[in-house]
Amino acid sequence: PIHIQYVTYLRGVITFDWGYSEVVNEEVSEALRYRFAATLELSILAFVVAVATAIPLGIFSSIRQNRWEDHGIRLFALFGSAIPIFWFALFLQYFFTLYTDWQISLRYDPILWEITDPIEIKTNFLLIDSIAAGSWPHFIDALKHMILPATVLAYGSMATIIRLMRGNMLDVLGQDYIRTAKSKGLSENQVTYKHGAPNAMIPTVTLL
């Protein structure tokens, strides 16, 4: 009966007995455990890429307001909001596969990791495992294979952060205390990065 199946299903969910997947030919819980590390590692890297790129671009766009640099960054952010991420990923994959020797279809180079210089994968976080093994080539290889997908995942977030940071900076740079700082003879860099940027980052950090 349906209600018995449903109760059995709920019991399995609670006890992490999620059955067997014929797609990957292993237990679902084991498949999730293996892939969760890869997903989390990629998500963290994408977050780092988005923040490290978008905040400086947003600040730079605000101090170059209505100039060609500002227009270029705003156009870049607009594309990030408008372009479907899956299409952008396919485009980059096609471009790098066709015009470079950058192999990005796997998490790592199997020849390096499994044949020429295998290391023990304990956590399935490849960056952490390569650091634990003290192997710089493995770390570089894992990072190289993650940069492109991390950039794709970060692009949409970058667009939002850039626009938010730019708007916050423009608001802050128009405040009275900024004009007072300028009247005291502080340089543009001091005004922007010491007085303006920290206050403009508060709403941005809240969003993150």
Regions found by a protein language model. Give the residues of each.
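An internal, D/E-rich "acidic patch" concept
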Residues: 1-55
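Short, hydrophobic secondary-structure boundary micro-motifs
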Residues: 3-4, 19-22, 88-89, 104-106, ...
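Short amphipathic alpha-helical coupling elements at transmembrane boundaries
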Residues: 8, 12, 30-34, 74-78, ...
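Membrane-water interface segments at the C-terminal ends of transmembrane alpha-helices
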Residues: 11, 77-129, 152-158
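Alpha-helical transmembrane segments of integral membrane proteins
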Residues: 36-69, 85, 117-208
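Hydrophobic alpha-helical membrane segments of integral membrane proteins
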Residues: 69-72, 89
